[in-house]
Amino acid sequence: MTQIYSFWRSTGMFAALLLCLLCTNLSAGTIYVQTNLVSNVLGLAPTTDPNLINPWGVSFAPKSPFWVSDQGTNLATLYDGAGNIKSLVVSVGPTPGPTGQVFNGTSSFGLPDGSPAVFLFSTLAGTLDAWNPGIIPITTSITVATTPGAVYTGLANGSVGMANYLYAADVTGHINVFDTNFTNVTSTTFAGKFVDPSPVAGFTPFGIQNINGNLYVMYAQLKGVIGQPGGFVDEFDTSGNFIKRIATNGQLFAPWGITLAPGRFGQFSNDLLIGQFGNGEILAYDPTTDAFLGTLNGKNGMPIVNDFLWSLEVRTMGPNVNLDALYFTAGIDNQMGGLFGEIAPVPEPGTITLLLAAAGSGGARKLWRRMRA
């Protein structure tokens, strides 16, 4: 009996200690760790790619590598979820290069070879460019639309009924919409759409993303290419009707990237994550109430920061993809460099439970040995 009491006292105290550590971790918030995967800077990441300069938008087919828009080199480069470089490199658009991009999983947006575009890009030159494997050479895209005076900084796709569209964020103050013939239908089919009923002077559309069938537009106050403090995020349906404002000013600093967190992402699981181009932080919001929840913090308790943060992406499948991670791109070194990486919660979900189980099983084995002695 003394041995049994001693066992429960020792293992119980250890379990209590672990429980205290767990409670402390929960009250302090989940710790997140960043893993650099690819960079143009030698030694900054396991993989070095000189083509990765100021990477903006990212897209992917369900089982494809990540396609990354390298604005600084006018290229699209491909990486798997572990940062391994794929051999295909695609030249995209006129200088000054690609920004947003989308994967097209429909049979629409046909190209001259008769097949639909697979990946589409927006550019700072005001063009839309498209690629599919039938283009010759396969390492180039083709320009399918040009809007004089436009500066496209983001791209999304969506549908209204059976009709498919492309939506381009234009920092001159518009969301321009294109049909499947790459015709600009902003002033016709979409006349008077994508209007915020409470506009904020000096702010312009900067990024755009389709999340669960609605379009989220990020607005920023821009001076050249440098974001100014502030910003807001609006939600529209794909017809361009205003639904609500998601977030405004507060912690926002030129928002651009946005996504829903994975289901196993610590305290911010399934929450809305918004990346800040202006200060490199990632903010979390409740996807139902739109309440601000906090920032993704590292081991030092401070926000994880990546200068000139662009895309935020989450995947449910793909080659070497971490399904519990948030992938990102950033134009480090004042947009003269590039970084592609992932952010994941630490400890991983279930770690404490496993420790408790290990402690219990280890203590049980010790008691068994004592009782047999």
Q: What is each model feature region?
A:
Residues 370-373:
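Short, charged juxtamembrane terminal tails flanking transmembrane helices
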Residues 29-345:
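Sequence/structural signature of beta-propeller domains
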Residues 348-366:
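A short, hydrophobic C-terminal helix/tail in secreted or cell-surface proteins
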Residues 2-14, 367:
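Bacterial N-terminal signal peptides that target proteins for export
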Residues 12-23:
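Bacterial N-terminal signal peptides
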Residues 24-28:
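Sec/Tat signal peptide C-region and signal peptidase I cleavage site
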